[in-house]
Amino acid sequence: LCVSSAEALEIISQNAARLAKLYRPRSNRYYFWLDDVADSKCHCPECQKLSASDAALMVYNAILRGLRLENPEALQCYLAYHDTLEVPKTVRPEKGIFLEYAPMIRDFDRALNDPESEKNRKQVASLPALLSFFGTENAQALDYWLDNSLFSGWKKPPKPFSLHKETLAKDVAYYESLGIDSVTCFACYLGEEYYNLYGQKPDIAGYARVLSGKAGA
């Protein structure tokens, strides 16, 4: 996708408007993302002047403009993930863009803000600056505590799953300390196939207890 193409951005806006006509969430928050691959940025002469984060924000701004043609209250996320974890340098978010932070490349046996984890240090390095840039209003953390597809290497059969409750609790507290009050996560490879394979349900209830503040219940 060449974000230096005005025509391409207009097509994105038009398609976003079509989607908004079909789908209007009660929260007015939309989570339309770029392709879920690393290093997918255009490298034409004009796009070379942009960081991956700047290029992504141009797309999300275009999506928001299209959404608001049908839903004037629409909000659209900026997904900080892989190449777009850094703060945009030259492009500003239009009103209605909010931060969605997804720290995928991390250690799950350590808290996200554990300074002893090199992976986690890299994932959180830009988070305070991202929150300063986008603001904390509507900011959301999208984590991977229940993503057994990730823990299984995206291969089936799924591996046995064990929830790192201590990590989860520390992560939630860290997000709250930064002003992020919306927390969610992927939950994959934990359905019927998992139950048939292992004869027990994964500890999704433990996740709910931590988020509700009833971890000891």
What are these regions (language model features)?
Residues L1-G216:
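Catalytic-core regions of glycoside hydrolase
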